[in-house]
Amino acid sequence: MPDSAHWVGTWTTAPAPAETGAFNNQTLRMTMRASLGGNQLRVRVSNAYGRRPLEIGGAHIALRDAGAAIVAGSDRKLAFGGAAAATIAAGAVLFSDPVALDLAPLADLAVSLYLPGEIPNDFQITGRYARQTNYISPPGDFCAAKVMPIASLTSDWFFVCGVDVLASPDTGGIIALGDSLTDGNISTIDAFCRWPDQLARRLLARHRGRPMAVMNQGLGGNRILYDIRGDSGLRRFDRDVLSQPGVTHVIVMLGTNDLRNRWKKPEEEPTAAQVIAGLQQMAVRAHSAGVKIVGATLTPFGNETYMADAWNPRREEVRLAVNAWIREAAALDAVADFDKALRDPEHPTQMLPAYDCGDGLHPSDLGYTKMGDAIDLALFE
């Protein structure tokens, strides 16, 4: 690797206040799928929302085999400034020291964290629901175990917010910034059906062009303008986009939850101009950092059952106005037309039934794949 090699995120998740989790002298083993290969790795651990310091008693990374098992010979003990244990201050992120491990693109990793102390519910754990099966041990440090004993299962990631690889100078990174439709809500667990997963597969399959990582920074419920289940898109843009290692492009799919106004607060009911202003601000901030921005059109939700009264004619007018701006905006470098990809031509306020998971809001596995297929790979040459 040349001296100009740089770190690029091969996997990420957006930190948020976890809705589950309490631990006491236990090991977590969590699965992540790499979008980009490499032979030098590091792990990022976040205590972004913790109310007090987080004690890490040990951490390992390995290639995942099946279930809670790891591939023999692939286990690597992580260190933090040369030490096996570490304390992460409230609100902080900790980077591990690099380790050597041959990682193929789209390979599954297992990151194990030993949490030696009690972490109660009021700690405010940092985590995200994962659409992956992850594992919690009985009491003890099982980071090095080839097959970790299992006390319980979880579909969340906890504390780990990124895995980076040392990559060639021309390698780029694509951030997928969005809400539950980027996070892959309702998609089949352990099937890797999110649209960023499909984008990563397509980028790898082209066998040419610039190497690109895909970092999923989707956050269920996320809005552009107001916080909900974590920071708003505008508030987290620096942390979840501009601060990510190796970022060169961002695809922004946000605005649907602004329109839906889940908490039904009149003062949070946005106009099209307010949503567009938020997207414009993201474009300015991206370009100021040398990052290209792709705007994704908002998909239809006219027959939504996930939340009663989410759709109304006024909100549809706002959606159409925002989409019209995205398709024509000089402020954006390109468009990913997810609305066109998913909508029913006969009922354009709704998704085509085959692309609808059944709640009128979230796509099916096929719909998520269709979204990943709708992105022009020429944008990343």
Predicted regions mapped to residue ranges:
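N-terminal secretory targeting modules
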Residues: M1-L177, S187-D190, R208, F380-E381
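Structural recognition of the beta-strand scaffold that forms the well-ordered cores
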Residues: G173-G178, T182, M212-G218, T248-M253, ...
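Catalytic nucleophile-elbow at a beta strand-turn-alpha helix junction centered on a G-D-S/GDSL motif
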Residues: T171-D197, G220-R223
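Oxyanion-hole/transition-state-stabilizing segment in secreted/luminal serine hydrolases
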Residues: S187, L219-Q274
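Signal peptide-proximal N-terminal region
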Residues: A200-M212
